[in-house]
Structure formats: structure tokens, C-alpha cells
A protein has these predicted regions:
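Phosphate/ATP-binding catalytic cores across multiple sugar-kinase/actin-like superfamilies
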Residues: 264-290
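N-terminal phosphate-binding loop and adjacent alpha-helix
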Residues: 32-58, 274
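Short glycine-rich phosphate-binding loop at a beta-alpha junction
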Residues: 60-73, 286-295, 396-397
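Phosphate/pyrophosphate-binding loops at sites that engage ATP/ADP/AMP, CoA/4′-phosphopantetheine
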Residues: 48-64, 277-287
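Flexible beta->alpha loop and helix N-cap segments adjacent to enzyme active/binding sites
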Residues: 9-38, 83-99, 104-107, 111-235, ...
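Extreme N-terminal starter segment of soluble prokaryotic enzymes
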Residues: 1-6
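Active-site cores of enzymes that catalyze phosphoryl transfer or operate on phosphate-rich substrates
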Residues: 208-268
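Short beta-strand-loop/turn "lid" adjacent to the catalytic site in phosphate-handling enzymes
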Residues: 54-89, 95, 108-109
Length: 471
């Protein structure tokens, strides 16, 4: 008997996921279908649903349970609205629906893909759903095969939801009434990202730039005794602004001159705070398995620092740790709620959960764009050709199998090139990606050699750890 649940996330990074008989069998970001980066909309991504179901050979009528997530809303108020949207689009479909809290969906996405029997779960993002008029900012759960239970939570002011406005990241524009509003760690990182001239969802640029700078502030992170620590809107912003005032420079000149140092400053603060929180959680709850989720944990420098500081823990981060992983958590929670059964070990089912394409469809696409190609029946022969091209410093567009979940290109939809040529990074950034020269790339090695090259504390299959290189 087929017991199938559908997970849906609306907002930014819309996504769809499918659980069948306790196993995740499909997950797809809407941006892969609508070709709109981060696919932002309150609308249900029906085309993405249909594409994934067609690929999996599942009818909408086979689905019994639906889980829905959003962000920065009282999610339970949306149940009737989205039930009506689904039942109006898919006629004569009988299903049960549950709206899942944003941070709980993050927790489910990472714990149920970890393979752990029991774990601490730490969620940190820009903001989750509303809690008494405020937004979730950091949450801690204890998870086992029976349930995921919230044990601690911190909230932030809902007034700072849109940080792109000048009154939230440039001190003279800040309303005095806002200065002491609480803000999440991830939101603080986003705030500094705007301060140094980047845009929404470009915190990864700040992380990349941070490696070129030096910390401007000697942080004295307080001892963490619970999750109710102070982090206000003006913190770091005010100190950097005072440095600008004493610099004798114009504000744009100051920011441009010191932007890598400002980036490094927020990176160091984030690392120190999160490491202190993790230490507090390990000490209090005496659990050495830790699952992480939320957009903050796309920061691979931070993630490696956690393992470097606490080498005895077992760490899992879902490859779709941002909001594109929400649908996975929603599907798991819907299945768990309505089926009321223990979910199976899904750690081996990730990250390749999207759609694959037949050779004929690929040929048709190449011919539609008048692109030349050679077709190889032999995989061995194809691999030799690829290896030869890489050796000759040619750049490979690698497209194979089912697409990855999450924002990282994990060799199913990847650009691959020779890392031994010193000019390759700059060449790809300039000629292929058309982006800033400081943007990094990830090295790829066979798993058996990963600790030969890198100071890894555990394996890194999802491009979510940034270890140092062994000499």
C-alpha cells in the first residue's frame, strides 16, 4: 500500500518534496522549473509539483497527506487558504493537510535525513514564523524516532523583517526606537551584508570576502547560560560607524576600503556566538549528536569551526539547509502526523532527489540551440575524455542523473575545472560566472583521499564544511 505525503514551501526558495512509506523519494526547488532565482511567491508551485510527480510516476490522487510551510506568518492561519487552493486546482482529490511551523520544518528536514537515533537540533536563520507577534530566530529541539520537541527558543522583533531599508543598516537612518530591538544571528549577518554593499540573499559573498580581511572588533562573547542572549539591531553597526567618523573618510570610501574587514568582523562574531551556544547546548543536554538547519548553516566556515572546536560530536547538516529544504521537513511532518509511524533512515537518500533527463531529451535540447556535441556509449570512454579536457585546462559543464537538493552544485549540475592551474579561479569568475574575483570554488576529491588533502573532522559530502588544507 502506498502512503505518500507531499511537502510544499511557499515564500522565497519555494520547493516540493515527496515521502513514500517513510522514505524521501523526491525533492525539487521551484527555481529549477520556473528558472527564477529563489522563486519567490505566495502561490503554490503547481508546475513544480506536476513535474516531480510525473518523473516519479505518481498521481496526485495517490497522495494522502500534505504539509505546508511559509515564513514570517502565523502559519496555522493559512491552513484553510492553502487547502482551498489545492482542492480547487486538483479536482476531486481527497487529502489531509497540516501547516508546519517554519523552524520545526527545518528541524525535521535535518534530523530525518541524519540517520541518528537521537540528536540535538539547532536552528538558526533570518527568521521563522510568528511567535506572539515576534519571529523565531534561534530554536533548539531534542529529536528522536518518536518526535521532535522544542526545548528552547529565542525570538526577534518582527519590525526588522526587511533589512534592505537604510534605517536598518546605516546608523544615521536608524530610528532610536528600533536600535535595541532584538535580531537573530543570521539577520545580523544579513544586516552587515547590506552595509558593505551586497543585496538580499548574498550573505555567501560576505563569507567569501571575509577570508581576505581582519576583524575590527575584539569581541568578548558573554557566557551563554540560556538561549535568551542579547543581540540588538545597533550592535556592530554602531561601532563600525564610530570608526568611520574618526577615519576622516567619506562614508562610501570608508565602506569600500574596509569592506573585507567588516565582512571578517561579522564572520568572527558569528563563529564565536554559535560556538558558545553549541558548547552550552552540549554541556546542558549531554547529547553528542547535533543536527543543524536554517540559512545560517550554509556558512561552511562556521560549520567547520564548530567541528574544530567540538571534535567529539557527530554533526549532520541537511544539504538543503536553507528554505528550499522546508518542503522536505513539511513532507516528513505531514507523514509523521497522519500516518503516525516511525520514519525510516533517510541518510542514504540525499542529495540527488530532483529530476533526471533522458539522452534523447538532452540531444534535442543541444540541437535546439545548435550546439555541437559528441555522444559516447561507453562511460569509461566518456570519463577519459573528461579527464583529458580537465588536464588541458578546459572547463567542463557536468550534467548527469537527478538534480541536487540545496543550493550547492554537487557534481550532478556542476562546473568542473583543473584546480592545479593557479589562474583557473580568476578565469572562471571573470569569463564564465561573471562575478567578483574573491568568490571561491570547492575542491572535489575522492572520499578516500579527503583527509590526505584536508584537515577534516568528518566527511564533507555536501559542500558545507570549509577545512584548512594539509601542508
Amino acid at each position: 500500500m502506498r502512503n505518500i505525503s507531499l511537502g510544499l514551501h511557499m515564500g522565497h526558495d519555494r520547493s516540493v518534496a515527496i515521502i513514500e512509506n517513510g522514505m524521501i523519494i523526491g525533492a525539487l526547488a521551484a527555481e529549477r522549473i520556473d528558472r527564477k532565482k529563489h522563486s519567490i511567491s505566495a502561490k503554490i508551485p503547481f508546475e513544480t509539483i506536476d513535474k516531480l510527480l510525473a518523473y516519479l510516476e505518481i498521481s496526485i490522487n495517490d497522495i494522502k497527506y500534505v504539509g505546508i510551510t511559509y515564513a514570517a506568518v502565523d502559519i496555522q492561519n493559512l491552513e484553510d487558504y492553502y487547502y482551498d487552493q489545492l482542492s480547487d486546482h486538483y479536482k476531486n482529490w481527497n487529502f489531509e493537510l497540516v501547516c508546519v511551523d517554519h523552524h520545526l520544518a527545518h528541524a525535521a528536514s535535518t534530523f530525518y535525513t541524519s540517520g541518528f537515533d537521537k540528536s540535538l537540533v539547532f536552528i538558526a536563520d533570518g527568521g521563522g514564523d510568528l511567535v506572539n507577534g515576534n519571529e523565531e530566530s534561534e530554536s533548539v529541539y531534542i529529536a528522536d524516532k518518536n518526535d521532535i520537541v522544542l526545548v528552547e527558543q529565542r525570538v526577534q522583533s518582527n519590525i526588522i523583517h526587511t533589512l534592505s531599508r537604510k534605517q536598518f543598516h546605516i546608523l544615521p537612518f536608524m530610528n532610536d526606537a528600533f536600535l535595541k530591538h532584538q535580531i537573530s544571528i543570521a539577520k545580523k549577518y544579513e544586516q552587515i551584508t547590506y552595509m558593505i554593499g551586497f543585496d538580499w540573499n548574498q550573505a555567501g559573498k560576505t563569507m567569501g570576502l571575509a577570508s581576505y580581511g581582519n576583524c575590527l572588533i575584539d569581541f568578548n562573547v558573554p557566557e551563554i547560560k540560556d538561549l535568551q542572549f542579547e543581540l540588538t539591531l545597533d550592535y556592530i553597526i554602531e561601532e563600525i560607524y564610530r570608526m568611520y567618523e574618526s577615519s576622516g573618510l567619506k562614508y562610501p570610501t570608508f565602506i569600500n576600503k574596509y569592506r573585507q574587514d567588516i565582512a571578517n568582523t561579522v564572520q568572527i562574531y558569528t563563529e564565536k556566538m554559535v560556538i558558545a551556544i553549541v558548547g552550552y547546548l552540549i554541556d546542558k543536554y549531554k547529547i553528542n549528536k547535533l543536527c543543524l538547519a536554517g540559512g545560517l548553516f550554509l556558512n561552511c566556515l562556521l560549520n567547520h569551526k564548530i567541528l574544530e572546536t567540538y571534535p567529539d560530536i557527530e554533526l549532520h547538516i541537511c544539504p538543503a539547509t536553507g528554505d528550499d529544504g522546508q518542503a522536505i521537513g513539511a513532507a516528513f511532518r505531514a507523514y509523521r502526523k497522519f500516518k503516525d509511524t516511525t520514519l525510516l533512515d533517510n541518510s542514504k537518500n540525499i542529495p540527488y532527489l530532483g529530476i533526471s533527463y533522458s539522452n534523447q531529451l538532452i540531444k534535442n535540447s543541444l540541437e535546439n540551440f545548435n550546439l555541437k556535441y559528441d555522444f559516447y556509449d561507453s562511460t569509461d570512454e566518456l570519463c577519459k575524455v573528461i579527464a583529458t579536457n580537465i588536464y588541458e585546462n578546459k572547463i567542463i559543464g557536468f550534467f548527469t542523473g537527478r538534480s541536487e537538493i540545496g543550493p550547492r552544485a554537487l557534481c550532478h549540475r556542476s562546473i568542473i575545472a583543473n584546480a592545479t592551474w593557479g589562474g583557473m579561479k580568476d578565469y572562471i569568475n571573470q569569463k564564465v560566472k561573471h562575478r567578483e574575483p574573491f568568490r571561491p570554488f570547492a575542491p572535489v576529491v575522492l572520499e578516500e583521499y579527503e583527509r590526505t588533502f584536508f584537515n577534516l573532522k568528518q566527511t564533507s559530502p555536501y559542500m558545507l564544511l570549509a577545512p584548512t588544507v594539509n601542508e
